[in-house]
């Protein structure tokens, strides 16, 4: 009997998107399992590639398979993917138009997809003799430092619990350890210490009172390194390296809180959702005005889920994953929570993933990719701010977290909750049709908190009468009132940097990116012009490169420019600027919010990131500096996005006992998105927008697929775009509507030209098969360097 493994190799191509059979060497039999990673020889040159084991089978006779190659190396000693995740990858392939290997890799922390070594760590079950034989007598050793014979013994030691294995990034330490000490009292009591060595005597007395081991770092706070070293060298202290989770210190900072009492609407929502845990069934849309206590509903639902012995996933948009938000979950559920988002280092992400995989964490709170968390027995999946476009991944594999959540909820019989104050039009339409259950929270959780008054200010009324381009007199007056009352202000501008572009007033020259069809953005803090697409950077021009004129002017606005205007107009105000540039450093986001929350600033000025998830009781004024920036994009969702953003940012005002006010500055005060946002009227906006969508045949009345072709040669990409269009017309029904091929709104980035085709359809049986064939066509030799993206239900058309 011969054991054979089915392996998906790490080559994301049409030709390799299938399992390959490999022989399991005798030394690996009994150690290999589905979900592990291996190194296998691949192709004619037997190049070593990583692969995932997705199946195991027994064959009667190897003579029937003489060409089988053996697996070269086992990379894991326990599976990194479970069967649930492997099944999920198979289901996702049908809608994301991606290769299976890309989907599998997206489920793992980045560290496991990079260069790393393994650390073999002894447990207390490993005796001294085996430690000498297999670990060179050390408590932990790098796998790369072991002999071949020692390496072959490791799987057996792992399975018997005598060693554990962790991963070490080649460029960064993956495992964080700290030194702990234990006191050898017998040695300490007989240790000779001079009466003149006062600090040594003090430390001896201190240690004699210690019954528990402690951290060496704590000793260093009390005594000098030389004094501590004396006791270590004398053998009175035994030092051991203890592995720590990098997030532990953060969890220790958060104080435990009690559950709040729910109002009638909140309690009804929790009861309805709880009934469905373990039953599956239709998802819930929880539509609640800003400040209505949706998060408290989530917390109570999770408490019920855990009481049933099940686990939970909470997805939050990356931009909303503030310490304020994560602390609410940690304060209720402590170290049962794992946090997963892009602000963590590779090592921290790995620690949290391992905490989930080991079963220690029962609640995962994270951004989009947390939907893949390797939890077992899921009882609830919650997607907060479900309308956010960031739940759709814009790189391969292009999945929407909501679609993956639907698959996982169905597989586990879990309740799926979609929460928002401003649900996406598609989600609300499904609730209207009865595809989703519909629950509402119509009033703020704090009975003293009122929905803020919203005033719209027309920029056109103040042309030539403004002290600064970004601030109208009514807004400045309201800000001054708040400063006088010692209240706080939040100001939002949907653009980072200084100005949107630089132009010569003599010849009209605009400084563009050489790689992209987009103007460069001025950044005064770095004194550079930057491209936000390809990261090209150059010095700020003081002379026009075209006509050598010095009449260079900065047009548009940005957070940095608004900050400069604000500090000039209101020198007494303490202003915090918060955008991608000021929050780039690790922990900066948290520090800025902490400073504002503790009253160290009067005004918080920022981009979209300040519109979500912030809850500061002293904020009584919110100002939107220009509501038009997202309104004028060439995208059918631009009105919806503007309405959602304005409603969300308005919700930051008056969340406690003080009344809130909102000022929206715009050149388009009569636009329906702004009018409905002023009235905080989601229902009115929904009905109006649905009428437009029906008229123009856009979602939710039709489904859409975006196809983008890219190449460095524009003539070539145009020709290929028309070939793809002809193929689609030939193989799809006449009920399908096609738009294009046309250049994308930004037609060139990274020196590649982009053309797009939009498909609109209601029901189309051949669509999946046809699109997969189009994907395969681009792999043919004559299409070398042609990039093709197939995006099912694209969230952005810009």
Give residue ranges: language-model regions.
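Generic structural signal for residues in well-ordered beta-strands
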Residues: 163, 237, 337, 454-456, ...
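Solvent-exposed, membrane-proximal periplasmic/extracellular interface segments of envelope transport
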Residues: 63-78, 645, 744, 749-762
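A general secondary-structure signal for short beta-strands and their flanking turns/coil
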Residues: 2-4, 17, 46, 486, ...
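Arginine-glycine-biased low-complexity disordered regions
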Residues: 710-720, 740-767, 791
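Solvent-exposed beta-strand sheet faces enriched in polar/charged residues
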Residues: 166, 240, 366, 492, ...
